[in-house]
């Protein structure tokens, strides 16, 4: 997969893995899986999620292309399972100015995966359920979804992209 334009400011940088035959070592996936990750280009640039180690090189190439020489301000981590969060520490090392956004449980799991020193406390933006983060024209709002899959899962929406019709 290469970079996909989702909108004028949002780019898909995820990777399609057609070589994997079992998801989580037990569920057949005859056509593979997609590791979804996005870059939001605004006054401050945010990367949403990383990908599995299997796809690191292609993903980093996509991220580099999407950033076009700029540096991200934030990495938003929605879920720490390795197929989503395997490259958190790697990306943080590549961009030492970048802050990492997650909830308290996210960082607890991150320390278990990468060690407490992987993401320095001053680089962590710990969000609460319903809090928002402005990138400029885009404002990300975080909604916790514990046990949708794992206890730390959260989702993000950008209200500027939601279109609601007026009642008739």
What kind of feature is each model-predicted range?
Residues 1-44:
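Zn-dependent metallo-beta-lactamase
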Residues 9, 40, 49, 79-81, ...:
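Divalent metal-coordination and catalytic microenvironments
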Residues 40-43, 135-136, 158-160:
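Active-site beta-strand termini and strand-to-loop segments that position acidic
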């Amino acid at each position: 997969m290469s970079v996909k334009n989702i909108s004028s400011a949002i780019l898909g940088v995820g990777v399609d893995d057609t070589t994997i035959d079992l998801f989580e070592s037990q569920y057949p996936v005859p056509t593979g899986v997609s590791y979804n990750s996005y870059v939001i280009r605004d006054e401050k640039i945010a990367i949403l999620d990383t990908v599995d180690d299997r796809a690191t090189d292609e993903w980093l190439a996509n991220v580099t292309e999407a950033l076009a020489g700029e540096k991200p301000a934030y990495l938003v981590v929605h879920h720490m399972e390795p197929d989503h969060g395997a490259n958190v520490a790697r990306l943080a090392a590549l961009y030492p100015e970048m802050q990492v956004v997650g909830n308290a449980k996210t960082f607890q799991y991150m320390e278990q995966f990468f060690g407490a020193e992987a993401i320095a406390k001053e680089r962590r933006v710990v969000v609460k359920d319903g809090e928002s983060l402005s990138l400029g024209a885009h404002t990300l709002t975080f909604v916790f979804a514990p046990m949708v899959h794992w206890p730390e899962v959260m989702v993000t929406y950008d209200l500027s992209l939601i279109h609601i019709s007026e009642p008739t």
